[in-house]
Curated annotation (Swiss-Prot):
Active site residues of this protein: 327, 372
Protein name from the UniProt record: 1-phosphatidylinositol 4,5-bisphosphate phosphodiesterase gamma-2
Signal peptide start-end: none
C2 domain mapped to chain residues: 1038-1169
Domain PH: 1-131
Assigned EC number: 3.1.4.11
Upper lineage: Eukaryota, Metazoa, Chordata, Craniata, Vertebrata
Function description: The production of the second messenger molecules diacylglycerol (DAG) and inositol 1,4,5-trisphosphate (IP3) is mediated by activated phosphatidylinositol-specific phospholipase C enzymes. It is a crucial enzyme in transmembrane signaling.
Pfam family, one: SH3_1
Length: 1265
């Protein structure tokens, strides 16, 4: 196998030679997971974009990967790609695999060079380039990103971009162009003389665009309190920030102690500028460069000192640490049918996870397998997993790894497990205590590079103390069944499970259903689906008008064309195209040769189809006496939808609703022309409700919402058949007369009316929402007489959602007054979510459940002859007359028997609990060889709930529900236990979608191993990633010393809590936000303090419309001050959402940090995706200030808290008086008087708090004398 070269010791000239060789490229064999045959390709490094590309020919790149996304470069034949292709003839020393991506499941590029020397060169070069990319300055990253944009429109890697291409690119990077005039004006401003920009001009255009959009942020540095005063900010180079000013900024605003050294400040500026012409003793930043610095990762909010390992903190017993832990580590997705993979173990270990789970079952040939038992998840070999653990356990962290074994194997296969552990892991395996006489667990330092086995252990007399993790309902029938779909008249496969006399089923498994083979399209009809084919156009003039309008909008490119049926010659066609500023036409003639229709423009070159003719002239020139021309851009047919079955030209809204109400299936849809307007509406069914959405016309485009542009309605439908239109709903069932006849049923009136929202329209959302209640997230003081003043926690009733971000509501004595919508959260929405959680709480399919059948209301019968081409069928016949039967089928007769028997026992109301228990009873035998490997993590269950007298050699495992019960009832007992013993908590069985529970309360009580699903990109996994970003990402974080104090209470009474600090945050702007789907993002930011219940609080900004590239919230956005009780155990979380066309929030990016790890000042917040992977150049700019609360100020904050609580009580009492006539009386006047007095007093207290914050800030902002 090829060994990695230590590139750190290579001289610079050798590094340059290696990089040059990679840039020139190497012919290699590429192994593709989707292809059984490897292919020869040229693989090369594109230095300008920092991408590895592979291509068959020089002018056509087949694929590429960003070098910053590389997670591992693995030498040898160590990927499945080599196995699939049976790469026998390629030597292992010439092979390597690049693993890359930003999701949990990584992509692979497996390569084989022709020589060992080439392989070494590539392994070394990739490592060098990856190191350089990860340490590149932000201006360098911006230049690379700009190159990618140019190359994305032209793979020839030219050094320029046209105005038309620029207009195409900007929406793709999340910026809405108001019109071609906007771009032309910008080009004039940067001095471009024509509609073609060089790369340097493109770079200037980008800088000018970003600066103009965000220069208002710099007003923050024109205030008297600023540590330096900026000059003119009208233009990017209108003024500058000089060395001494920058030092003042770093020292006083950013509180960077290293900035006391002027040389370090000079070095920071010089490296950031990266301009040899400005490498002087007195460097400066132009104002646009200063603004870019504020957004850059060089100015990150994260304190980089926590990237280093604190070795002094690694000498405590293991029980004093939080330990990064994974649940069902082998899974790459959900718990029912996802893939099990050794790569999942590698991904978790290299992410710093230190406790992983092995779910072991008897396998073939006497060797165990790992998978999620009793489900359809795939199986992997135990031996392969142990080898992967050996190779990757200590790559990221050298501290111990705990293997949590869930044992289902026979004794014989357990012996094999013990043998493999010892042979493969060798000296890594911990087989005896570090200290024989110790009375506590060893420290992480004592256990470096050791692997610990957590497994059941035989006692001194051979007895077993077991801990069987909760696997509720795992032995009841569950698996895939076919269900008969009466709409599509076909069998669809669903995952089903029985629990509590109910059969639950998930959504249909579309990829598993056999599809009818696609019929080959006859050559003569190939052009029908092409957008350049316009069928019969009214006249020659109409065709010319279409071309003229298209060319006026797109830049009049020669060769722009369309094809139409000939007006005068049957079977012939007309090619209309744009050349030299006018439209020209050519007749496409047809002739019959040997019974086959041929088409031609010139007599000497005929084609079998119109499609073949057009494809030829798009690649080769059309030559005639006057000109040579190649067909370029097709003019799309504006009306291809008219022939589609889902389109209705004259259908009213009421008629559309009536049709949709008869199809009780999410994804049913139609599109109709709206009466009296040049717009359309899509009517669809989602979540059981009928909804509408308007589609407007903008020139030749169809626009859904404000920025989702489509060339045609056909393209719109095709897109949303593959992507979610509303929440998770895709278009699936075109509503046609045939479908209505097939599914002939009564109208479902309930589907039309929805208590939460009846009509979904991006432009016309019903503003009247009576009786809605919202909760204030923060204090707000009215700025006008028609606005509400309220305190955090206040309930505002009878809310009416007005447009523009201002809503109306009732609070106290003030009726229907305005307040900002981003200061509140909708309680009713939260209640609906909580209700949904309650419904799925005990469902065996959890949130994946799409339907439930109560088996007590059915009789089950077999279909002896089968049905609908399935041999093994059973039918649930309803006991209630009139209800339709439900038909199921299996693949095997054994499955049919098992399901039929289980359902029959329920429907006959037989008590089979005792029989089932006997049938599924487990043999708890343990192999001595495996038992002997258990040293410290011996599970116990006999006295698991008794937390007294912990044994440090034992570990107690709790399902999340049991752990939550203990936390609520005896949090202090659990904390005391965890100071000496270990606990592991894992998700409940109902989380089949692999969702995660909130780990915080368990961390608060000292639980070390709070196991989460690493493959799930949710909030709690992101918090987990944030916690373990401390201490150099070792996977071990020392719990605060205060938690080991005898006086520490993880859940103190309110009277015992003290505010220790305040955190003030202001969101100023963002850059390079990611883009979802076709629409340009309309972003807003949610800022949240995550911690104990008494610390949790959040705030939302307003929505910025149609700008995800450079949105700004300053200067209108106000500062928000959070009160923090325990800064050591709280997180600051930023989440960026986009508001979609239905006013629903969609996750875009996040950044989550432990509060102890953030820095003050004007800070960049680098954004991450759901999996906490960096997003290129994406960042927020925020102002952040932390201030400890002095003991003398605690009384003031305590008074504020008490008044807020009292105001909430008074407001609720007043609401009751005003909504219940029988309660009206004299008491109301007293309540009103007290409410008003308290409100004034609260405002005074709040002003006093704010004044102290301002005074503190001014004292920190003095100039150097």
């Amino acid at each position: 196998m090829t060994t990695m070269v230590n590139v750190d010791t290579l001289p610079e000239y050798e590094k340059s030679q290696i990089k040059r060789a990679l840039e020139l490229g190497t012919v290699m064999t590429v192994f593709n997971a989707r292809k059984s045959t490897p292919e020869r390709r040229t693989v090369q490094m594109i230095m300008e974009t920092r991408q590895v590309a592979w291509s068959k020919t020089a002018d056509k790149i087949e694929g590429f990967l960003d070098i910053m996304e590389i997670k591992e470069i693995r030498p040898g034949k160590n990927s499945k790609d080599f196995e699939r292709a049976k790469a026998v003839r390629h030597k292992a020393e010439c092979c390597f695999t690049i693993l890359y991506g930003t999701q949990f499941v990584l992509s692979t590029l497996s390569l084989a060079t022709d020589s060992k020397e080439d392989a070494v060169k590539w392994l070394s070069g990739l490592k060098i380039l990856h190191q350089e990319a990860m340490s590149a300055s932000t201006p360098t990253m911006i230049e690379s990103w700009l190159r990618k944009q140019i190359y994305s429109v032209d793979q020839t890697r030219r050094n320029s971009i046209s105005l038309r291409e620029l207009k195409t690119i900007l929406p793709l990077v999340n910026f809405k162009v108001s019109g071609i005039k906007f771009l032309k004006d910008k080009l004039v401003e940067i001095g471009a003389q024509k509609d073609e920009l060089s790369f340097e001009q493109f770079h200037l255009f980008y800088k000018k665009l970003m600066f103009d959009q965000q220069k208002s942020i710099l007003d923050e540095f024109k205030k008297d309190s600023s540590v330096f005063i900026l000059g003119n900010t009208d233009r990017p180079d209108a003024s500058a920030v000089y060395l001494q000013d920058f030092q003042r900024f770093l020292l006083h605003e950013q509180q960077e102690l290293w900035a006391q050294d002027l040389n370090k400040v000079r070095e920071r500026m010089t490296k950031f500028i990266d301009d040899t012409m400005r490498e002087t003793a007195e460097p400066f930043l132009f104002v646009d460069e200063f603004l870019t610095y504020l957004f850059s990762r060089e100015n990150s909010i994260w304190d980089e000192k926590y990237d280093a390992v604190d070795m002094q903190d690694m000498n405590n017993p293991l029980s004093h640490y939080w330990i990064s832990s994974s649940h069902n580590t082998y899974l790459t997705g959900d718990q029912l049918r996802s893939e099990s993979s050794t790569e999942a173990y590698i991904r978790c270990l290299r992410a710093g996870c230190r406790c992983i789970e092995l779910d072991c079952w008897d396998g073939p040939d006497g060797k165990p397998i790992i998978y999620h038992g009793w489900t359809r998840t795939t199986k992997i070999k135990f031996d392969d997993v142990v080898q992967a653990i050996r190779d990757h356990a200590f790559v990221t962290s050298s501290f111990p790894v705990i293997l949590s074994i869930e044992e289902h194997c026979s004794v014989e296969q357990q012996r094999h497990m013990a043998k493999v552990f010892k042979e493969v892991l060798g000296d890594m395996l911990l087989t005896k205590p570090t200290e024989a006489s110790a009375d506590q667990l060893p420290s992480p330092s004592q256990l470096r590079e050791k692997i610990i086995i957590k497994h059941k252990k035989l006692g001194p007399k051979g007895d077993v103390d077991v801990n069987v993790e909760d696997k509720k309902d795992e032995h009841k029938p569950q698996g895939e069944l076919y269900m008969w779909d009466s709409i599509d008249q076909k069998w669809t496969r669903h995952y089903c499970a029985i629990a509590d006399a109910k059969l639950s089923f998930g959504d249909d498994i579309e990829q598993a259903v056999e599809e009818e083979p696609v019929q080959d399209t006859p050559p003569t009809e190939l052009h029908f689906g092409e957008k350049w084919f316009h069928k019969k156009v009214e006249s020659r003039t109409s065709a010319e008008k279409l071309l003229q309008e298209y060319c006026a909008e797109t830049g009049a490119k020669d060769g722009t064309f369309l094809v139409r049926e000939s007006e005068t010659f049957p079977n012939d066609y007309t090619l209309s195209f744009w050349r030299s500023g006018r439209v020209q036409h050519c007749r496409i003639r047809s002739t019959m040769e040997n019974g086959v229709m041929k088409y031609y423009l010139t007599d000497n070159l005929t084609f079998n189809s119109i499609y073949a003719l057009i494809q030829h002239y798009r690649e080769a020139h059309l030559r005639c006496a006057e000109f040579e021309l190649r067909l370029t851009d097709p003019v799309p047919n504006p009306n291809p939808h008219e022939s589609k079955p889902w389109y209705y030209d004259s259908l009213s809204r009421g008629e559309a609703e009536d049709m949709l109400m008869r199809i009780p299936r999410d994804g049913a849809f139609l599109i109709r022309k709206r009466e009296g307007t040049n717009s359309y509406a899509i009517t669809f069914r989602a979540r059981g409700k009928v909804k509408h959405c308007r589609i407007n016309r903008d020139g030749r485009h169809f626009v859904l919402g404000t920025s989702a542009y489509f060339e045609s309605l056909v393209e719109l439908v095709s897109y949303y058949e593959k992507h979610a239109l509303y929440r998770k709903m895709r278009l699936r069932y075109p509503v046609t007369p045939e479908l209505l006849e097939r599914y002939n049923m009564e109208r479902d009136i309930n589907s039309l009316y929805d208590v939460s929202r009846m009509y979904v329209d991006p432009s016309e959302i019903n503003p009247s929402m009576p009786q809605r209640t919202v909760k204030a997230l923060y204090d707000y003081k009215a700025k006008r007489s028609d606005e509400l003043t309220f305190c955090r926690g206040a309930l505002i009733h009878n809310v009416s959602k007005e447009p523009g971000g201002w809503w109306k509501g009732d609070y106290g004595t003030r009726i229907q007054q305005y307040f900002p919508s981003n200061y509140v959260e909708d309680i009713s929405a939260g209640d609906a979510e909580e209700m949904e959680k309650q419904i799925i709480e005990d469902n065996p399919l959890g949130s994946l459940c799409k339907g439930i059948l109560d088996l007590n209301t059915y009789n089950v019968v077999k279909a002896p002859q089968g049905k609908n081409q399935k041999a093994f069928v059973f039918i649930l016949e309803p006991k209630k007359q009139g209800d339709p039967p439900v038909e199921f089928a299996t693949d095997r007769v054994e499955e049919l028997f098992e399901w039929f028997q289980s359902i029959r026992e329920i429907t006959w109301k037989m008590d089979t609990k005792e029989n089932n228990m006997k049938y599924w009873e487990r043999n708890q035998s343990i192999a001595i060889e495996l038992s002997d490997l258990v040293v410290y993590c011996k599970p116990t269950s006999k006295t698991k709930d008794h937390l007294e007298n912990p044994d440090f050699r034992e570990i107690r495992s709790f399902v999340e529900t049991k752990a939550d019960s203990i936390v609520r009832q005896k949090p202090v007992d659990l904390l005391r236990y965890n100071q000496k013993g270990l606990t592991r908590v894992y998700p409940k069985g109902q989380r089949v979608d692999s969702s995660n529970y909130d780990p915080f309360r368990l961390w608060l009580c000292g639980s070390q191993m709070v196991a989460l699903n690493f493959q799930t990109p949710d909030k709690y996994m992101q918090m987990n990633h944030a916690l373990f970003s401390l201490n150099g990402r070792t996977g071990y974080v020392l719990q605060p010393e205060s938690m080991r104090s005898e006086k520490y209470d993880p859940m103190p009474l309110e009277s015992q809590r003290k505010i220790l600090m305040t955190l003030t945050v202001k969101v100023l702007g963002a850059r390079h936000l990611p883009k979802l789907g076709r629409s340009i993002a309309c972003p807003f930011v949610e800022v949240e303090i995550c911690g104990a219940e008494y610390d949790s609080n959040k705030f939302k900004t307003t929505v910025v419309n149609d700008n995800g590239l450079s949105p700004v919230w300053a200067p209108t956005q106000e500062k928000v001050t959070f009160e923090i009780y325990d800064p050591n155990l709280a997180f600051l979380r930023f989440v960026v959402y986009e508001e979609d066309m239905f006013s629903d929030p969609n996750f875009l990016a996040h950044a989550t940090y432990p509060i102890k790890g953030i820095k003050s000042g004007f800070r960049s917040v680098p954004l991450k995706n759901g999996y906490s992977e960096d997003i290129e150049l994406a960042s927020l700019l925020v102002f952040c200030e932390m201030r400890p609360v002095l003991e003398s100020e605690e009384e003031l904050y305590s008074s504020c808290r008490q008044l807020r609580r009292r105001q909430e009580e008074l407001n609720n009492q007043l609401f009751l008086y005003d909504t219940h006539q029988n309660l009206r009386g004299a008491n109301r006047d007293a309540l009103v008087k007290e409410f008003n007095v308290n409100e004034n007093q609260l405002q005074l207290y709040q002003e006093k708090c704010n004044r102290r914050l301002r005074e503190k800030r001014v004292s920190n902002s003095r100039f150097y004398s």
